[in-house]
């Protein structure tokens, strides 16, 4: 073997090890929000999304914009029940299910710019939760909303420019759940829908809403795709709330990163630093 061949093999090995390190999580440490930073939150976290430089957390009465290290940049109020959020081409979309008596059972989709200035509201005749954008189409949860355990849900689809009327599709995610879809994410090819179900949690669908499979991955309060340029594969993130009732600690949130591989979500933040 020549020196040139040895050099090329060594270079290829180092490159492979570098990308393996990225793929298996050494570059995606868990992120913690500051204790008490989100005390203004109403109820529990409803959904989350990320841009190239910020996170967005949706709660029942508003949306937070946070830095990548979990500190608040801005908060805006929104009508209850404000639900899941998604980020697409510089804009934030929020699914809303109205809770007031006059509009109970109806909802809307709010469109914001990246600084959370409201651009427009698209009114709907159904309550909504769970939202993402794929191929310039908004996918949103459209019921049912009952707490009683049931199987099957309904998804609405509308162009991201809101031209035309929404289409509705009945789906079977393969397992019983409470309420409708809670959070939706995408890797640019498939849809990942999170439901209230501790046994499975996430149903995977094609863009035409054909079922692909289910994942045992609880992520009903915050789940999204994470924009980054380090790998060709999509990285997802999950948000969980952490607190200790006995110690009367103020809650904080932990963001971990995951990759979809062989029908499973692989944890890329295996070393979750304690706070």
Tell me what each language-model feature is.
Residues 30-39, 70-77, 116-122, 164-175, ...:
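A short beta-strand motif characteristic of beta-propeller blades
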Residues 35-61, 81-84:
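Beta-strand-rich domains and repeat architectures in extracellular enzymes and scaffolds
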Residues 57, 94, 140-141, 193, ...:
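Residue position within the beta-strands of beta-propeller blades
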Residues 42-47, 79-87, 124-135, 176-184, ...:
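Repeated scaffold domains used in trafficking and secretory/extracellular systems
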Residues 70-107:
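Blade-loop segments of beta-propeller domains
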Residues 173-205:
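Loop/turn-rich, solvent-exposed surfaces of beta-rich toroidal or solenoidal domains
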Residues 52-53, 89-90, 135-137, 188-189, ...:
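Short coil/turn segments that connect the beta-strands within blades of beta-propeller domains
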Residues 57-58, 100-106, 146-153, 196-198, ...:
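Short, solvent-exposed loop/turn segments at conserved positions within beta-propeller repeat blades
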């Amino acid at each position: 073997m020549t020196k040139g061949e040895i050099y090329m093999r060594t270079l290829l090995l180092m490159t492979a090890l570098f990308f393996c390190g990225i793929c298996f999580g050494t570059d995606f440490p868990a992120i913690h929000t500051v204790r008490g930073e989100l005390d203004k939150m109403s109820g529990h976290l409803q959904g989350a999304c990320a841009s190239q430089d910020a996170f967005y957390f949706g709660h029942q009465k508003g949306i937070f914009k946070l830095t990548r290290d979990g500190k608040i940049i801005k908060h805006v109020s929104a009508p209850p029940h404000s639900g899941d959020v998604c980020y697409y081409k510089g804009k934030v979309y929020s699914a809303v299910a109205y809770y007031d008596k006059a509009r109970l059972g109806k909802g809307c989709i709010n469109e914001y710019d990246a600084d959370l200035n409201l651009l427009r509201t698209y009114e709907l005749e159904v309550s909504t939760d769970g939202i993402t954008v794929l191929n310039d189409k908004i996918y949103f949860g459209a019921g049912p909303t009952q707490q009683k355990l049931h199987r099957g849900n309904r998804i609405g689809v509308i162009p991201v420019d809101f031209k035309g009327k929404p289409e509705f599709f009945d789906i079977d995610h393969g397992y019983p759940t409470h309420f409708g879809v809670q959070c939706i994410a995408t890797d640019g090819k498939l849809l990942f829908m999170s439901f209230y179900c501790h046994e499975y949690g996430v149903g995977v669908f094609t863009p035409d809403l054909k079922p692909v499979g289910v994942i045992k991955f609880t992520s009903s309060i915050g789940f999204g795709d994470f924009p980054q340029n380090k790998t060709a594969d999509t990285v997802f993130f999950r948000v969980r709330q952490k607190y200790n009732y006995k110690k009367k600690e103020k809650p904080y949130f932990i963001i971990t990163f995951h990759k979809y591989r062989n029908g499973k979500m692989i944890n890329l933040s295996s070393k979750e630093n304690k706070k």
